[in-house]
């Protein structure tokens, strides 16, 4: 009887658990084919974490086009079955819901059911999508619920393809084994905000969170129109946050006596403070305080207090250089003393040019220089260089490469391919005995390569401000074979490859010399201002009454330069007095309007004034900027004057009239909308890439650049290098000079031989 009761209880419990089991197995249901995804049923294991009911939430859609490796789509193959995306979660938020919406197409040759797509989150299996007969060769839409309890600060979604095209004697490298993931696939997330204590020990969180991959948007609030000292303090803080944001990008909207509905930085003194701080006690030292937004406790404000503007500057430098000591809800910045002066070209984000650099110094994460798999993924190393590095007559760049790899089982065509900026450099065989795994290379740069069998010239390699050095280890993997009756199969073993941290690359033998104006150098590297990482050689010229849009342009610009150099602009000088321009040996950054002393139409090729504008266009405009632009091509061909009602902005570069080695970059706009276009261009990497030459015109349609006007040179070259540079663009003149040199040398030798012959034949000569 007890046994019967036990069986009955087990049956009842099993039936009660059956619906939950079916719900939990929802991800494994066949996906929809050419249909919109349906909302999956929620299982008990995917319940949201407990948060306050009043906590604000936000919904995020992360498409594969945004977060997957370029181009956003994934091609999963038999020998390379894994693909994935990565995303972070802010420390002041918690995920309450997550759904992966996949768009994929399986090969029509796959065996149904035996072939499948597995979805992992942080190596936890979230769901399995079997490939059905109806899906073969067709675009398929599927939803996979993600358990939010497994979402952490940093997350990796891995897609693993298990493919079979026959029951026996399969070849994993068969071209019929594939499954393509579309770039429209997306991860839908719902985040709830958490109440955060006012504790600066976590600074810069929540104002900047390294786990957040989105561009940093951090409003800056002033009591009213800021004076020069407040502008400088805000620039220091903005550039420091820009240096932390790095590749994410940054934006600093400016507000006068108005609080945004998000985390923000507030500047206030005892005499000048926003209205919401009117009851705050006066301070007697530079103070940095974290407090709640008066209308929303989930929003935090970082208030930079001071008795006067001098205190604000000290507090700003404390944020930039002493934040590691922050703790509690407020700190007092007693003193900030510079110990060592910055040197030219010592930006932390740039490759050192004073000595050889190890690859270990170039790493940005721990496992960057290693890879594994039947076909190991490429190893990439970023090289951010000063844009004025002179490489025209260089024989190459010295690189001492130390690498390790899994030996090929036989002597075959396995090799290591080295590429720079997607252009092939050299290939080296991977020996089965590993007799040699250290290479002394010289990477050819800007000299051209000749194919050994034809007269076709391979395009010369060019190093820019941002470069990618790629190492591809390509293995010729032996695969099983045989017939159905006599099949040979084995389990493939992944290959492992490592580039040694002690490998070096040397840029220390090159001069600094560049043809200016070059807006590409400014857009991609902040040059010439970034030559000194702390902007100590930069003078920013602001209007006497800057608007919010003009202040935002200043902060966005110094923030972008900070992101490119990795160092804050602690020594930037700002002025609104054009009389000080001539007395300062510095590069000029002009916001708003060009001062009268610089208005010389021989130097400036674009002026934006109200709704009227004029521009000089060059005689010949090429699709890509030349390394050595021809003087005839850049001569002004026509001047057009246009009056229009639409907004326009411009970035203009020209030589300083006060110093031949100094440059002027002017950021101009004709209206508030024009400044919005200008700020969008400064913060958009795609629009920055379209800037080159001396003038970049920004309209609603995009960015159009011109190289027009005089070219000048910044830097130093020895006289013989300068001579070669001058003659490099004039081959006929070079040939004439070479011929004259040969004739002159021949004449000197002839005269010398005549003298020697005369002496030898002279009987009176002893």
Curated annotation (Swiss-Prot):
Example of a GO biological process term: cellulose biosynthetic process
Protein's membrane topology: Single-pass type I membrane protein
Sequence intervals crossing the membrane: 730-750
Pfam families: BcsB (PF03170)
InterPro entries: Cell_synth_B, Cell_synthase_bac
GO cellular component: plasma membrane
Keyword Signal tagged: yes
Subcellular location: Cell inner membrane
Pathway the protein takes part in: Glycan metabolism; bacterial cellulose biosynthesis
Record topology, Cytoplasmic segments: 751-766
Main location group: membrane
Keywords tagged on the record: c-di-GMP, Cell inner membrane, Cell membrane, Cellulose biosynthesis, Membrane, Signal, Transmembrane, Transmembrane helix
Periplasmic side: 36-729
Signal peptide positions (record): 1-35
Family label: Belongs to the AcsB/BcsB family.
Biological function: Binds the cellulose synthase activator, bis-(3'-5') cyclic diguanylic acid (c-di-GMP).
Subunit description: Tightly associated with the cellulose synthase catalytic subunit.
Name the record gives this protein: Cyclic di-GMP-binding protein
Species of the source: Salmonella typhi
């Amino acid at each position: 009887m007890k046994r019967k009761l036990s069986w009955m209880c087990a049956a009842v419990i099993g039936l009660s658990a059956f619906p939950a089991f079916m719900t939990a197995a929802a991800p494994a249901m066949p996906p929809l084919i050419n249909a919109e995804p349906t909302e999956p049923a929620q299982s008990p294991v995917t319940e949201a974490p407990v948060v306050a009911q009043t906590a604000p939430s936000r919904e995020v859609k992360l498409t594969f086009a945004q977060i997957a490796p370029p181009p956003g789509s994934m091609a999963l193959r038999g020998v390379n079955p894994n693909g994935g995306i990565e995303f972070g979660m802010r420390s002041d938020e918690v995920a309450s819901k997550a759904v992966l919406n996949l768009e994929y197409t399986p090969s029509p040759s796959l065996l149904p059911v035996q072939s499948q797509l597995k979805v992992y989150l942080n190596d936890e299996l979230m769901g399995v999508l079997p490939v059905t007969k109806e899906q073969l060769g067709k675009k398929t839409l599927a939803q996979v619920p993600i358990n939010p309890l497994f979402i952490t600060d940093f997350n990796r979604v891995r897609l693993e393809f298990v493919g079979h095209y026959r029951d026996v004697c399969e070849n994993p490298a068969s071209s019929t084994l594939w499954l393509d993931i579309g770039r429209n696939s997306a991860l839908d997330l719902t985040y709830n905000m958490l109440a955060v204590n006012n504790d600066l020990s976590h600074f810069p969180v929540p104002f900047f969170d390294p786990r957040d991959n989105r561009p940093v948007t951090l409003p800056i609030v002033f009591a009213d129109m800021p004076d020069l000292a407040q502008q400088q303090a805000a620039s220091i803080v903005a550039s420091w946050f820009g240096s932390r944001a790095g590749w994410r990008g940054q934006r600093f909207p400016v507000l006068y006596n108005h609080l945004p509905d998000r985390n923000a930085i507030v500047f206030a003194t005892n005499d000048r403070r926003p209205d919401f701080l009117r009851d705050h006690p006066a301070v007697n030292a530079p103070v940095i305080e974290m407090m709640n937004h008066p209308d929303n406790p989930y929003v935090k404000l970082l208030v930079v207090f001071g008795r006067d503007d001098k205190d604000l500057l000290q507090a700003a430098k404390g944020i930039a250089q002493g934040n590691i000591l922050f703790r509690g809800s407020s700190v007092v910045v007693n003193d900030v003393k510079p110990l060592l002066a910055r040197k030219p070209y010592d930006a932390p984000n740039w490759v050192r040019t004073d000595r050889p650099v190890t690859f270990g110094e170039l790493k940005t994460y721990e496992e960057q220089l290693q890879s594994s798999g039947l076909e190991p993924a490429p190893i990439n190393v970023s090289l951010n260089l000063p844009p004025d590095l002179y490489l025209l007559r260089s024989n190459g760049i010295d690189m001492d490469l130390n690498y390790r790899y899994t030996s090929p089982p036989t002597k075959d065509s396995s090799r290591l391919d080295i590429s720079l900026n997607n252009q092939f450099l050299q290939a080296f065989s991977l020996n089965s005995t590993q007799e040699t795994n250290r290479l002394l290379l010289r990477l050819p740069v800007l000299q051209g390569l000749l194919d050994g069998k034809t007269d076709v010239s391979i395009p010369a390699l060019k190093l820019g401000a941002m470069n990618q050095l790629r190492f591809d280890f390509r293995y010729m993997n032996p695969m099983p074979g045989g017939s159905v009756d006599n099949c040979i199969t084995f389990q493939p073993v992944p290959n492992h490859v490592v580039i040694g941290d002690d490998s070096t690359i040397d840029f220390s033998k090159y001069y600094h010399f560049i043809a200016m104006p070059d807006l590409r150098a400014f857009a991609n590297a902040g040059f010439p201002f970034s030559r000194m990482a702390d902007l100590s050689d930069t003078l920013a010229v602001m209007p006497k009454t800057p608007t919010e849009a003009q202040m935002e342009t200043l902060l966005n610009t110094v923030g972008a330069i900070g992101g490119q150099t990795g160092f804050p602009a602690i020594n930037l000088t700002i002025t609104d007095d054009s009389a000080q321009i001539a007395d300062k040996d510095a590069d000029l950054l002009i916001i708003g309007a060009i001062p009268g002393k610089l208005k010389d139409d021989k130097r400036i090729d674009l002026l934006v004034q109200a709704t009227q504008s004029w521009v000089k266009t060059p005689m010949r405009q090429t699709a890509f900027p030349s390394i050595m632009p021809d003087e005839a091509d850049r001569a002004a061909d026509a001047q057009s004057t246009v009056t229009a009602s639409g907004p326009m902005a411009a970035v203009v570069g020209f030589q300083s009239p006060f110093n031949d080695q100094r440059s002027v970059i002017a950021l101009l706009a004709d209206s508030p909308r024009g400044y919005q276009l200008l700020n969008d261009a400064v913060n958009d990497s795609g629009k920055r890439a379209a800037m080159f030459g001396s003038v970049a015109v920004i309209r609603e349609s995009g960015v159009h650049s011109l190289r027009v006007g005089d070219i000048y040179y910044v830097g130093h070259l020895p006289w013989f290098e300068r001579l070669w540079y001058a003659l490099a663009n004039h081959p006929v003149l070079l040939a004439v000079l070479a011929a004259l040199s040969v004739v002159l040398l021949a004449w000197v030798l002839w005269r010398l031989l005549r003298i020697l012959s005369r002496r030898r034949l002279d009987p009176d000569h002893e």
